[in-house]
Amino acid sequence: MERVGFVGLGIMGARMAANLARAGYALTVHNRTRSRAQAFAQEHGATLAETPAEVGAGSDVVITMVVDGGQVEEVLLGEEGVTQGAAEGTMCVDMSTIAPSDTRRIGAALHERGIGFVDAPVTGSSPKAEDGTLTIMAGGSEADFERARPMLEVMGELIVHVGELGQGQTVKLINNAVAASNASTLAQALIVGKATGVDLGALIRIMGAGSGASTMLTLKAEPMRTHDYSTLFKLEHMLKDVRLCLEETQAAGVPFPAAAHTGEVLAAAMGRGLGDVDFAAIVEVLEGLADTRL
């Protein structure tokens, strides 16, 4: 088995790394908040690294699950980054969601050092990370993907090699923009139902049985209806992903009006201080526009 390093033990990362530990991989872990990494190491028998460079020195494959491209670059290429300790032939797998252009740039720098790179962002919330049933879309060479596959299969249920380096990120961003737009449309539908006196339970059942069915309906209708924004995926992270998707559409010269509108609504929710709660809180802004409370 490859020795695996894991950097980024947040809501998703800790659960993903735990599945690798349970599968028998020898883990070296690092987290910006040291106490999280220390607790994880004690619980799962992992080695605690003080810096990403130490992770690189003790690993054949290094997985990153952090917030944005700046963090990925710092973790992999910074003064105390993975490349400061990693040997030639090491491979890095970034499972964060970042700009495809950042992925390609970081990948080029790694390849100059003889280090492979795969971008493998995920879809699915923390329960799926816990169960190892995430959907993973991977970009990179066929050889690098096949090397990463055994570890990805521990963390995910559906693993798809979508193309060259960076295309995993592109697919993920499009998917999340669709999900966010769907959630916004769902919130609007519930508000219309409330304003017109419709029984919301009946509306949700009918939509779920017909052409209005969606994953967002299943996951977010009741939280929106009850204003329960327990965090499965932070609103600020969804806004980041939608904005990154819109950067891609602008570069390609194509419109994505649904995502553009949803980005504005998410930004308004951020302005209300809702960034740290679940993106189901998008309903708060739309309730305000309609002057109707679910």
Region annotations inferred by a language model:
Residues 165, 169, 213-279:
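Interdomain hinge/lid region at the active-site interface
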